[in-house]
Each structure stands twice: as C-alpha cells, then as structure tokens.
Amino acid sequence: MVTEPAHVTSSEAELLDRAEALRSDAELLEEYARRLRATVDTLAGCPAAPEWSRPTLERQAAACATAAEQLRTAAEALRAHAAAGD
C-alpha cells in the first residue's frame, strides 16, 4: 500500500503571495472609496442629481473602506501565519 507523505497545502511563499494580493486588493478598494466620495462631492453641487444618489454612494464608499480594512487584516494574518511557520 502506498501512502502519500504529509504535506502542507500552501507553502510559505504561496501564503505571502496571497497576502500581497489581498493587500493590493485593499488598495484598490480604498481607491474606489475615494472615487465614490469624490462623486458624492460632485453630486452635492448638482441640482439634477437624485436625492438618493449621495447617501447610496456614501454607503458604498463606506463598504469599500470596511472591506479594505478587512482585507488588510486578512493579509496581516496570513503574513503572521507564514512567519510562524505553521
């Protein structure tokens, strides 16, 4: 009977690559939040903009910022896990 050797599902390098991808995604989400807030500011001076547009865009910007923070937290956890060699 042949048994496979125990192996780690992800190498340390793979974890660090994933952590970097998460960090990069967090930066993108921060940029999207910035753009959404800029749009909110622009619409504030536009009388033709529907009333619902600014609050909706503000909520989306906040969601992007929250997601960015969560991705950063996940990236840091992966980095710590890789550094610990677990």
Model regions and ranges:
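N-terminal secretion-targeting helices of virulence/extracellular proteins
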Residues: 1-86
